[in-house]
UniProtKB/Swiss-Prot annotation:
Matches recorded under InterPro entries: ATP-grasp, ATP-grasp_carboxylate-amine, ATP_grasp_subdomain_1, PreATP-grasp_dom_sf, PurT, PurT/PurK_preATP-grasp, PurT_C, Rudment_hybrid_motif
Domain ATP-grasp: 112-301
Class of the enzyme per the UniProt entry, highest EC level: ligase
One GO term describing the cellular component: cytosol
Record note on quaternary structure: Homodimer.
Name used for this protein in its record: Formate-dependent phosphoribosylglycinamide formyltransferase
Binding site for ATP: 107, 148, 153-158, 188-191, 196
Positions that bind Mg(2+): 260, 272
Keyword terms, alphabetized: ATP-binding, Ligase, Magnesium, Metal-binding, Nucleotide-binding, Purine biosynthesis
Gene symbol of the encoding locus: purT
Family recorded in the similarity comment: Belongs to the PurK/PurT family.
Amino acid sequence: MNISNIKIMLLGSGELGKEFIIAAQRLGIHTIVVDRYKNAPAMQVAHESYVIDMLNSDALEQLILAKNPTYIVPEIEAINTDSLVKLEAHNFNIIPCAKATKLTMDRQGIRALAAQQLNLQTSKFAFANSEQEYLDVIQSIGLPFVIKPVMSSSGKGQSIVKEHNEIKKAWDYAQNGSRGHAKGVIVEQFIDFDYEITLLTVRHKDGTSFCDPIGHIQKDGDYRFSWQPHTMPDTALAKSQEIAKEITDALGGYGVFGVELFIKGDEVFFNEVSPRPHDTGMVTLISQNINEFELHLRAIVGLPIPDIQTLQPSASAAILLEGDTANASICGIDKALADANVDIRIFGKKEIHGKRRMGVVLAKAQNTHIALETSKQALAHIHLTK
């Protein structure tokens, strides 16, 4: 295999894409990245970068035809997936495949696959395309429930509704968080689960591999902390791996899939799946012998994937900062790095208008509890320059 002849085009240039591009650069692979704005994180480390509206089919197809990449790797959902389906039919290699990208871009498609075709256990759910339909389905779902836009990213528009006086506010919040022109929502019965995990699942030429389960804490629908390994009963872990393999086999293609699951005792409920590295999986930058971005790259280009090992208990903490500036300056990194068990990634984003994830703290320790506390202590030092 001569990987120096490979060209990878990344559609989306966020922080996860940046780590993926770094992994590709280390192996001498030519990298091209695309996003809707200049100087996005992955653009800062790629050979070539382009700014286009990836929902515009003409712009997207013209760029791909002009650059003729070996692999096209979607990093975000805001892409014209019909174009990817068409390009795949003309022998372009979409990762993991156009079907997976299209199905997982909206919650209605993936929930139909999981619950109706594969009969995986999920929470009770219903879809609504108007506020009146939303009010109607609440009657059958009952309180408390979770509402999410059918199309959104990074937890935008998600909320848990526990009281009747929160119902209208939750609808409005979902509409504001929805991507594009989609107004639909999914309403799910709230599961009083014991914990939730991400099971990073790698489909590659030699089969399917699993990383150790990653525990995480979400707030406002977005990841704040994660840790690995998350200790769980053997029965629940086996069920989790079975579900993850079933859903990823149905989607097809090669690469890393982030499978989100709720665990209650030995019961496992499917929640969501992303056909790409997962934000909670940033902990693997410090915890594993091969991190999730390297695993994604290896699976895509056909490199060997040996045993995936968790080297030590580890945790990550999202650096979520709040402000209103076009030139963010971050302080406190020196204090955070005074601990030998701490590492940091700053993503290179300059603009903040409200809250924005600007980096991640990584910590290792003799157990995940201490690693999580260490990450929180380091996080407390980091802030915007006043």
